[in-house]
């Protein structure tokens, strides 16, 4: 699964996920993309599950790019532990997603196959998404 190899600090504050995606909002590498229309967090497991769904559907047909990376640690305290005594340990990694962000890209397959593969991938994700095609000349 995806996670950073090294970080300067182990834990991070929660923060707020606001605004729209300005970077990574266009299909840059492939012909088709899966773009987020909702906002939220994608865990490394969800990103991997969607990637597997895409790969399984297109078989050996095309090429896939994952445009997001889970670089934010989420800490959790163990079950049945009293409040206080510091922050919990990092449990998993997430990518903060803003509306407009392209999550996955694909090339080398037909549009119908890409649409179906992205539909299967979107079912694995907790945010709303839409299918986008690359604008030639843009």
UniProtKB/Swiss-Prot annotation:
Signal peptide per UniProt: none
Gene Ontology CC annotations of this record: cytosolic large ribosomal subunit
UniProt KW Transport keyword: no
SUPFAM superfamilies: Ribosomal protein L16p/L10e
Keywords: Ribonucleoprotein, Ribosomal protein, RNA-binding, rRNA-binding, tRNA-binding
InterPro entries assigned to the protein according to its UniProt record, in alphabetical order: Ribosomal_uL16, Ribosomal_uL16_bact-type, Ribosomal_uL16_CS, Ribosomal_uL16_dom, Ribosomal_uL16_sf
Biased composition (Basic residues): 1-13
Pfam family, one: Ribosomal_L16
Region (Disordered) residue spans: 1-20
CDD domains on file: Ribosomal_L16_L10e
GO annotation terms (biological process): translation
Gene Ontology molecular function, alphabetical: rRNA binding; structural constituent of ribosome; tRNA binding
Function: Binds 23S rRNA and is also seen to make contacts with the A and possibly P site tRNAs.
Quaternary context: Part of the 50S ribosomal subunit.
Family: Belongs to the universal ribosomal protein uL16 family.
Protein's UniProt name: Large ribosomal subunit protein uL16
Source organism per UniProt: Bordetella avium (strain 197N)
